[in-house]
Amino acid sequence: MTSIEKLLVQGIRSFDPREASVIDFYSPLTLIVGQNGAGKTTIIECLKYTCTGEMPPNCSSGQAFIHDTKIAGESEVKAQIKLRFKNPIGKPIVASRSLSLIQKSNKKQEYKQIDASLQSYTSDGQKVSKSFRCSDMDKEIPDLMGVAKPILKHVIFCHQEDSNWPLSESAKLKLKFDEIFSAVKYTKALKSLKDKRKELTTLIKELKLRLETISANIEHCNRIRKELIKAEEIYSNGNKSLEDIKIAIIEKQKTLSTIKIAESKLQELKNEVTVLNARKLEMERVKNQLFNSLTEVYQNETDEELVFMQSEFNRECETMATAEKELLENSEVLLSQKEVINNLIKENSSQKGRLQSLISQQDSILSDRDKQMKELVTRYKMSDFIQIQLPYQKEIVIKFINEITQKFDTLTSGISNYSKTNKQKLNAIQMKINQKRVDSNQFTSSSNEKMSTITLNSKKIQSLDQEIQQHTNSIGEIDTLEKQIQFSQSELSILKSDANLQEIQQSLDNLTTEKLEIEKEIQSLQSSLKLLNLQASSRTRLNIKRKEIQQNQQNINSQLNSQIINSINLILPNEFNNDNNNDDDDDQFRFNIIQRIEPIVPLINKKRLIFTNQLNELKQQFQILQNKKNQIDAQLTSSIEPQLKKKQIELESYEKLINDSKLKQSNLFENVNSNNNNNNNNNNGITVLLFENKINEMKLSLEKLEKSFIVLESEDILYKEYIEKANQDKECSLCKNEMNGNELTSFVHTLETHCNDIPNQLKQLKIEISNSKIQLEKFNKLLPIIVKREELIEKSIPELKESQKNLLEQQLKSNEMVLEKQNQIESLESQSVLYQQVTLVFQYIDQTKQSIQSIESEIQKEEKEIMKQSSDLRTIEEVDKDLEIQQEQLKTIEKEISNFTNKQKNDQIGIFEKERQLISIKNQLTTIKSASGIIDHLRDTKKELQSNNQQLQLEIENLQQSIDQSNNDAKQLENEFQQLEIEFEKKIDAYSKEKNTFSVRLDSINSLQSKILDPSELCKQLNEIQEKNQELESNLSTLSQDYLIGQQHISTIQQNLSSKDITKRAISDNISFRQHKNNVEQIIRQISRKNELIKEMMQSQLEIDSNKLEQEINSLKSKFDQITGQTAVLQSQINSNRQELSKPTYKNIDDVNKDLLIKLQTTETVGKDLDKYYKALDKSLMKYHTLKMDEINRSIKEIWQTTYKGSDIDTIEIRSEESGTANKTINYRVVMIKGDVELDMRGRCSAGQKVLACLVIRLALAENFCSNCGILALDEPTSHLDRANIESFANSLLNIIESRKSQKGFQLIIITHDEEFVQYLSRGNYCDYYWRVTKNANQHSHLERKEIAEL
């Protein structure tokens, strides 16, 4: 077991920072004694800090934990704590922590952790040191000590301020026990499993929904694929037919084109001849007209001479035209100059009008300015300006503006200063008010404190009266107690003579020596085994499980104590006596009892068949019925009824949507309803089947319309070609019959009428297709609603109503059965108490046996696993065999030690119990004898408290007067503050209004002054404009004369040009006549050449039937158009299907479906496994917690009953209760039990009972949780305890030491100021020395070891 040996302290709290203090810890008891404030608790704080890293409470983040720099007179104080201890295997370890406290310049102190290290020794004896971060060392030391950190914090090294934590608030108590049981990490594990299960459940639902969607998509995808394959096959055949037709048409068109080219050339020549003849006639007519129109015929001149004459006349005319152009340009320049001058005159006239307007406005502006200035002079009594006559001169105005501006600035600054002064006054009054309120609060607080002191003193007086009464009543019991002392002493001497403690101790020493030798041999074998075996951790687990089996067997033996045996004798006298008569050996005796209990259990169960079994069965039935009833209630209220309501609301919403759609599309719904006249059960008269049929009909109708649209488009193109061909060839393109004029006109008119009607038909078809698509889309959207509505009406709602009806019937039956079972349980519960104790023992033994069997099966599994993975089986088997032999020997010795220990323990307990009773009686006698002195002391204390109360009452009255005075002064100051504030606000408002008026007037005067101009300057500008106008009018007159002269020259030139033009025209007409004559002769020659070519082509043209060829081509084209239309529809369908298949929804849809299916199945498997894990872990935790709490409460009961001397509490227990929440949290509370009555101890016990209960609980926790660490430190355990309980507590500690002293490493550390308590503890002779803590001359804590005999 772990044990601590030495502690070095330097610079902690009041310990000297320059010199280290060392304390040795003894086994099994270490006593530390000192006055209050000497530094005793610092030792516990250092132990706790070294082992856990936890600072003491209220130490300012470590600054108060180190010796203060101001007291030491240094800027830095360094501190160190060293602890030497041995781990559970006896290996020495030294833990060291170094700290410092630095004084900063800003009067603040800085705390630092300098170093944290561990020192240990190797097998060769060499020292090994390792440094850690503080957080790592906080985890390392508890592991080395073999105990959890919460046990070190709250149990072993519990601080004095936290020692009463078992009776703290429920939340704090739960936090402590959760840390001790390590509940947080297991709770987190459970919560993590639960959260993960919820996530998986949600994921499974999502995966199922996705699978349903994907399955529907797969069906749709397969259907589209089939349609696509079929359409592609038809489309491929159609394309092949089109290629063949196209090749045939091209060949026939080549032949026809050759013929057409020849015909067209012949026709072109004929046309050209016709045109030339027409041109010839026209030119002859023009030639004759020209000849008739000639005024003069030039017959003697040649053509060249006529052209020369024409050119000369042209040159003269051009010269005259140039002169005319120049004159016209000069005229335009003169006109533009006149326009410019007119614009300048207009502009000067407008500027002249503006100046005249300004001159007329100056008087009104001056008058307005002077009026406003006069008002300001009168308002503010400006003496310098009162006597000045109007209008004001410019210098007067400037001076006035300057002065009035200065007055405005003075007014603004005055307002600001006034506001600042008044705010200072208000702030001063507010500060006085605040001070009065602070004084009143201080007086009130002081009065409340004194009142609480009076109340506390009154309670103390009542307590003193009770103690005086108790001591007065106990004086008459002296003779009775003396007789009891004599009788107890005689019984004690008899018990000591009967017990052979020395012989038993000698046997135990010999067996312990032998056990140690065997343990060393086992350790040697185990070390050899570890070298050979790679599964060290598995071997360790095997050893732990074997120890668990031994511990469980010991627990079974401890359960079969004398009390249980007596109980079995009472229940089964014959069976038990037959087994017990001839057995001397204790182990064999208990083994026989255990063997006999197994066949006895059915016998007991038969006897309890009427009581316990029937009661348990009834309780189970009752619980099942109650759970069923609760489930039915919950299912009705939380599941069925909300679902039914939800479904009905959903149905109403669907009905509303359908009704709205019926109103909007009444004609369509009438068609649907007409097909459903015989169906009266379905609401709205619409079924899913009829609705789907209607949608299919609409799809067929839409397909027919689209086909009609494509056919009409083809007809439009084809008929236009027929019209064109008919006009060209005068025959029908289909039948190739020639048509005369009327037939052709009628034929073309019929085709054109049909073609003209096609756009209207196409437009009408587009509208019908669009309407059909819209209606189809609306019906498709409405189809899911119809489906859901029908499912609700026919399935969901009837099923829910049927479930509701069945649940209501079950609820009625369950209520009747629950009442019946409850009455039966109440009648049988009182009859099962007699068998409860023995049954609980049997249950415990049965559970322990099951646990042993479970552990043995786990051991077998571990051994099989190790043997499978082992590489050297033979060597391991040999070592295992030797190890088993040694372990068997060790078990035999341990059984013998256990037998001797139990016998020694029973004898010691009997002797100790008699000694305790004797000491208790002596203490009562001493207490009663000293009662008279105590009564006088209590009465003096009572008088002193009464006088203190009177004094405090007078002080409270004086404080109340001060409070009233402060409140009155505060009210007066508040009234003054409000009056000043109102007056200030009124004056500020008046000043602000005056300032605004002043600012508006000043701005107005400045604006008017800026508009005033010099009149002389305006008149000067007006004269200049008038002079400019006169000059411009003179220039305008000159330009007008020049313009008239130019116009006269232009008229003369134009007359000359007109006379020359007559001669020129005669020459031109003669030239034109001669040209036309030559052209007519040239055309006659062309006509003769063309006629010769026509004769040649008509002779060489082959006679080929072109009409039949055209009919064949038209037939092929018609077939080609028909197939083209079909392929276009197929191509559209193929593209649509391919687009549909290329959507992300259908891409890799088979793989997605497969992956989703696998994921769903694996997720469901994982969810089931998580449920199993959660239930197994939860069950294991609750079972462990229940067993551990039973062990703790048994230990508490044993210690309490041997310690507490009062008769008001039989025992105390820790109750652990599961909360009703879903998280299954466990709440704890400490209860005190008297008879069958159980009360919460918190708030109902005295201070002494509180301290004793907390100590007992800590002792019990240490006993049950510290299997590898036998250390326990108690700091001032006797505070608030009376003398009788102090002595009894000391005896209990001695009993614990006595029972544990054989355990290697058990240490009890007690810190106290009560030397009498130390004397009680010294009676056990478990320590020769004690440590005394004192303060030296420098007020540093000093440790000194002294002999216990000196006390």
From Swiss-Prot:
Described function: Component of the MRN complex, which plays a central role in double-strand break (DSB) repair, DNA recombination, maintenance of telomere integrity and meiosis. The MRN complex is involved in the repair of DNA double-strand breaks (DSBs) via homologous recombination (HR), an error-free mechanism which primarily occurs during S and G2 phases. The complex (1) mediates the end resection of damaged DNA, which generates proper single-stranded DNA, a key initial steps in HR, and is (2) required for the recruitment of other repair factors and efficient activation of ATM and ATR upon DNA damage.
Catalytically driven reaction(s): ATP + H2O = ADP + phosphate + H(+)
Recorded family membership: Belongs to the SMC family. RAD50 subfamily.
UniProt GO BP: chromosome organization involved in meiotic cell cycle; DNA recombination; DNA repair; double-strand break repair; regulation of mitotic recombination; telomere maintenance via recombination; telomere maintenance via telomerase
Cofactor note: Binds 1 zinc ion per homodimer.
PANTHER family: DNA REPAIR PROTEIN RAD50, RAD50
Source organism, top-level taxon: Eukaryota
Keyword Nucleotide-binding: yes
Organism: Dictyostelium discoideum (Social amoeba)
Protein name: DNA repair protein RAD50
Cofactor(s) the protein requires to work: Zn(2+)
Domain named Zinc-hook: residues: 688-784
UniProt free text on domains: The zinc-hook, which separates the large intramolecular coiled coil regions, contains 2 Cys residues that coordinate one molecule of zinc with the help of the 2 Cys residues of the zinc-hook of another RAD50 molecule, thereby forming a V-shaped homodimer. The two heads of the homodimer, which constitute the ATP-binding domain, interact with the MRE11 homodimer.
Gene3D superfamilies listed in its UniProt record: P-loop containing nucleotide triphosphate hydrolases
PROSITE patterns: ZN_HOOK
Record-listed ATP binding positions: R13, N36, G37, G39, K40, T41, T42, I66, D68, Q160
Positions contributing to Mg(2+) binding: T41, Q160
Binding positions for Zn(2+) per the UniProt entry: C732, C735
Enzyme Commission number: 3.6.-.-
Molecular-function GO term, any one: ATP binding
